[in-house]
Amino acid sequence: MAQQEKKEKIIYVVTHGADDPERAILPFMHANGALAMDVEAVVVLLGGAVMLARKGFMNHVFAGGLPPLKKLMEDFLAQGGRLLLCTPCIQFRQIGESELLEQAKPIAAAIFTEEVLSANAVLNY
């Protein structure tokens, strides 16, 4: 029996939200490109970027010349991209899980570390 080849995986770490819309939008553009190439794409939101996972928040993030964040995030999730959130970051901002997008998954540091160690590349925005 032939050994199944492991799928390539890229993690996009996002640390900016509405404070820097371009840096919030670009990782989702790149992650969508990875998914189109059949590469597993995982976006991890840290710090203030966790706000991007609040229901409706993405509707208000725009950067000149780039597609709207709302469309990029919807496409990312529809293609099977995974959206992970820093649990302490959402707790610090007093964001309840009911306020988050359904597909957003809060994670602890150990899970984040496992994801990073299993990836072919980790990009930070």
Predicted regions and their residues:
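Short, glycine-rich nucleotide/cofactor-binding loops
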Residues: 12-25, 57
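Histidine-anchored nucleotide/phosphate-binding helix
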Residues: 24-38
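Anion (oxyanion) recognition and catalysis
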Residues: 35, 77, 116-117
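Short internal beta-strands
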Residues: 41-47, 83-87
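N-terminal beta-loop-helix "entrance" segment that forms/cooperates
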Residues: 49-63
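Short, flexible loop segments at the rims of nucleotide/cofactor-binding pockets, characterized by
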Residues: 59-64, 99-103
